[in-house]
């Protein structure tokens, strides 16, 4: 979709309409990583400028200044995600098969503590700066476990009544969590540690990734069942609009500075959406990526996006050994 700027002719006094072409993304490079295990979330520690890539029983760490691997956090049982509490210089890894959250030092990458949880399938995990607590979402238990980043102790396990996927904090006292098996969104009050509201997301089905625009108080939920991205009013819960995206979405990122939304999809595409206003959106690019490259992180400094995936044998889900990598895309 074209946006329009208006320049006024000094001499003629006439308005001249000039089209502005939206920024396109292109492939930049591939960063090869060791190992042949499964993979899930990626996340960027913006303070230390490191990229963390989940990979089977370990996390690969990439220095974003050089875009080279610098460490491996291993000895885990089945990692999913990591959340950063830079206030204590610690990362919190969700270890689904270990039924725990593993705490690591963000400078040395050494394990500090394993926090065993009364839950199963630890998956999505975020840091809430308002409460200075970690929220670890546990799929099989249909709950979220809350951890104090200072004491490294479990504060409470909250029943969600459905299978949680990813979540986002508004930084002001609320956490929003996609409930995949109910096609809804839970609003969690971080002060009372209770579910405050439930927002139905229809026509969205099977919501996974989620991002938040604090300026317009809009939520962006990526939905697998209908291959759509739903824009939701965070205050009322109203679904404003739904945009078409690729199949198998897993991650959603919002770049507030450039007003762009990215949805990474398992069908070898990343859908890029332009935010025209709080309630108006348009798809501006379907970026060709890699098959099953469905997880993503964005460096807000460079505007690069990072997606991870191995190569697969044709027509199968069998991984070709030694092919796991991070694929980097940048503005053209």
Model feature map: region roles:
Residues 1-2:
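N-terminal secretory signal peptides that target proteins for export/translocation
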Residues 6-17:
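Bacterial N-terminal signal peptides
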Residues 15, 21-332:
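Predominantly soluble domains enriched in secretory-pathway, periplasmic, or organellar proteins
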């Amino acid at each position: 979709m074209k946006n329009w700027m208006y320049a006024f002719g000094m001499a003629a006094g006439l308005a001249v309409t000039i089209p502005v072409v939206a920024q396109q993304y292109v492939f930049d490079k591939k960063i090869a990583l060791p190992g042949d295990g499964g993979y899930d979330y990626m996340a960027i520690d913006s303070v230390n400028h490191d990229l963390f890539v989940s990979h089977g029983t370990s996390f690969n760490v990439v220095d974003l200044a050089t875009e080279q691997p610098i460490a491996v956090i291993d000895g885990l049982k089945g990692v999913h995600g990591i959340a950063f509490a830079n206030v204590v210089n610690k990362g919190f890894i969700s270890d689904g098969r270990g039924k725990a959250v593993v705490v690591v030092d963000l400078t040395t990458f050494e394990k500090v503590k394993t926090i065993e949880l009364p839950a199963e399938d630890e998956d999505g995990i975020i840091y809430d700066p308002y409460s200075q607590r970690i929220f670890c979402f546990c799929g099989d238990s249909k709950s979220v476990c809350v951890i104090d980043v200072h004491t490294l102790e479990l504060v409470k396990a909250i029943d969600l009544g459905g299978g949680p996927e990813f979540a986002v904090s508004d930084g002001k006292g609320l956490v929003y969590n996609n409930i995949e098996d109910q096609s809804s969104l839970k609003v969690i009050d971080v002060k009372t540690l209770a579910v405050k509201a439930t927002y139905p997301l229809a026509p969205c089905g099977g919501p996974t990734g989620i991002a938040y625009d604090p300026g317009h108080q809009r939520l962006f939920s990526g939905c697998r069942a209908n291959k759509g991205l739903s824009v939701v009013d965070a205050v009322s819960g109203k679904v404003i609009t739904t945009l078409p995206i690729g199949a198998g979405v897993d991650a959603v990122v919002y770049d507030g500075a450039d007003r762009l939304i990215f949805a990474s999809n398992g069908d070898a595409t990343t859908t890029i959406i332009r935010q025209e206003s709080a309630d108006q959106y348009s798809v501006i690019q379907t970026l060709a990526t890699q098959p099953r490259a469905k997880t993503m992180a964005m460096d807000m400094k460079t505007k690069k996006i990072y997606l991870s995936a191995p190569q697969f044998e044709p027509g199968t889900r069998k991984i070709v050994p030694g092919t796991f990598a991070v694929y980097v895309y940048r503005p053209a």
